[in-house]
Regions:
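Nucleotide-activated sugar donor-binding and catalytic core shared by glycosyltransferases
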Residues: 1-152
């Protein structure tokens, strides 16, 4: 069991997602792997990577019990392709994490369809761990892919 965290490749920092992970680290499966992108970060007990090849990225996602990612469509689709339900935090303009808030709509939509968890202080990681984390059957994945495609 492990946790995989991805901040994406945006040049803007995303410390808010890392703060969420740090607050929840006592209940997260170890080891914790972080694809940090351009965000400067290191912490004892975490294995960090600036960037990963697509194959390595998928390998980490596939092997992890918990996936915590930014709200970019590509990362979300990768998790859903693996039939996993990720914990997602949208990058926000007001924190200078992105140029706009386009990730918010996608995250809200997917949460309403119960395909993702939204990263918040109220999220109970122990309950996430106790749920079956493979949530998508083939037909619902096709439907969801069409929804995302229309959105982006």
């Amino acid at each position: 069991m492990s946790t995989f965290v991805s901040l994406g490749n945006n040049k803007k920092n995303f410390y808010r997602l890392l703060q969420f992970v740090i607050k929840k680290e006592s209940v997260l499966p170890k080891p914790i792997y972080v694809q940090k992108g351009h965000t400067i970060f290191s912490r004892k007990g975490y294995k960090t990577y600036k960037f990963l090849s697509t194959d390595k990225f998928i390998q980490f996602m596939s092997a992890s019990k918990i996936i915590i990612i930014h709200g970019g469509a590509g990362s979300i689709i990768n998790a859903l392709n693996l039939k996993k339900k990720p914990i997602v935090m949208a990058r926000l303009k007001k924190y200078n994490e992105h140029v706009n808030n386009h990730q918010v709509d996608l995250v809200k939509l997917l949460c309403s369809k119960k395909k993702i968890f939204i990263a918040s202080k109220y999220l109970n990681i122990k309950k996430v761990l106790n749920k079956k984390n493979k949530i998508i059957n083939k037909n619902s994945f096709i439907e969801l892919s069409e929804t995302i495609r229309k959105y982006i």
